[in-house]
Amino acid sequence: MQTRKTFSWIKEEITRSISVLLMIYIITWASISNAYPIFAQQGYENPREATGRIVCANCHLANKPVDIEVPQAVLPDTVFEAVVRIPYDMQLKQVLANGKKGALNVGAVLILPEGFELAPPDRISPEMKEKMGNLSFQSYRPTKKNILVIGPVPGQKYSEITFPILSPDPAAKKDVHFLKYPIYVGGNRGRGQIYPDGSKSNNTVYNATAAGIVSKIIRKEKGGYEITITDASEGRQVIDIIPPGPELLVSEGESIKLDQPLTSNPNVGGFGQGDAEIVLQDPLRVQGLLFFLASVILAQIFLVLKKKQFEKVQLSEMNF
């Protein structure tokens, strides 16, 4: 009898442990799946709108610079570097989800021409791998290999991101031609201000949802505030919830207006986008250009030699 009870107790404990582990896995997976750049991938078929605006700007409201460097021209079936720079002050700290301060992260989206894609590992040189570090790039969609995303990654280590790109070969891909192509890039540093569902993060300013008097301010145990605004004319009360992170700007008894900032804006990051151009160069055209330059140089040499020969003939005739 005692053995049966012990076995039953062990079985319950194992079942409970499995349930707890399963819940932790689900919560962790959900947290990861909602991280940048999954937000854009889940909500938009294409990260670049018809207006040219990259959709990351919908969540990262502050405008910051970003720079991209690519070769002026590349040959078919060649691996080259696309270097994206996301500059910011390394001394800055951002508000984390729990309201505490921490280092900024960065992320980027690179929109390449059709046919261009991430270079396979066996085509990447050791020098390029060293520049890439431990970054793991992914396609925006399985069917959109020309659109690459990365992030969030530590900004102090990866404010300069090197993408290894493989150029297409028009001989193998009939829809690719030897032309000049545009490349678009978007880069952010720090957390966003708006979530995809339209709700605010704690990395933005909070405004009053009503006009009136600040009748009560309650500081929550885990951080953040609960602000009660009383409309003296109607006697109506509105409660605004402020999450941990932003600093409070108002005090009890203060008269405020509708949409007046209740907090500071803690955001120190932002998003920027840029573009560049790259030429997919025809090797035959390059060979033709080299042949032409060689012909010009040879012609110049022959002209110089002919001129010297003519001068010698003239000199000999004058002496005669």
From Swiss-Prot:
What is the membrane topology listed in the Swiss-Prot or TrEMBL record?
A: Single-pass membrane protein
Q: Is Thylakoid among this UniProt entry's keywords?
A: yes
How the cofactor is bound: the record states: Binds 1 heme group covalently.
GO terms in the biological process aspect are:
photosynthesis
> Where does the chain cross the membrane?
286-306
Tell whether Thylakoid is among the UniProt keywords.
Answer: yes
Q: Which GO terms describe its molecular function?
A: electron transfer activity; heme binding; iron ion binding
What name is this protein filed under? Answer: Cytochrome f
Q: Which organism is it from?
A: Manihot esculenta (Cassava)
